[in-house]
Amino acid sequence: MPRKHLIANQINKKQQSNAKLWQKLAKEIKAAVKVGGTDPETNYRLKAAIDKALTYNLSKDSINRNIYGNSNKEDDQLIEAEYEIYGPGGLGIIVRTLSDNPNRVISSLNGYISKLKGSLAKPNSVKINFQEQGIILTDLNNYHDEALLELLIDYELIDINSDEEGYEIITVPNAYYEVKKKLEAAGFKIHHSELKLIPLLYVQLTPEQNEMFERFSASCENDDDIQWIVANNQ
């Protein structure tokens, strides 16, 4: 199975059954509802949040409770922010936060950045090097490449990769849900799917730089105020 997009730099797969991860997924659902309402068909962000929550095994009951349940005072005060960071060796990092205490976020993040030997970047100076894409990993379903291309000919695709275990279909964001629906209708088993920011260019870090980034990443994963990070390291 092609794994380059699945494994890379967002929520770490080792946290798949971690309560902290589920807490962050639930928080994103609540934030999406606050902004756009409870209908995922008209709330693009909520639809993406539900899709991701299901991918990481958050139960449907928990999802529904976070959509329709009463919010508490802390939920109502959640503030979103996105920080762009320059790291060592040309590393570019985007950090998304969701917190009721922005001062705490800045204080914590400055500490992580200092240990990384990085610096805060101006808005869009890092993000310009990323592109949102829909990533769908499937089984082969007895399809060869040409047959799959014919099945998806009406949709805007970025790329299709395959190996002996399955396909990796990469779409533009607007085509993601329709492509996924088409694949499911054709009998494909979806192993993993999500919308995510993908680097347009990757950098190769030295072992020392990679160790610093791993510590930075672990700090972010363990921070309740940080929803996710992406970076352009290989």
From Swiss-Prot:
Its main location: cytoplasm. One of its GO terms (cellular component) is cytosol. Keywords: Cytoplasm, DNA-binding, Transcription, Transcription regulation. InterPro entries: Integrase-like_N, TACO1_YebC-like_2nd/3rd_dom, TACO1_YebC_N, Transcrip_reg_TACO1-like, Transcrip_reg_TACO1-like_dom3, YebC-like. The keyword Transcription regulation applies. GO terms for biological process: regulation of DNA-templated transcription. Gene3D superfamilies: 1.10.10.200, 3.30.70.980. It comes from the Bacteria. Belongs to the TACO1 family. GO terms for molecular function: DNA binding. The keyword DNA damage does not apply. This is Probable transcriptional regulatory protein MYCGA1330.
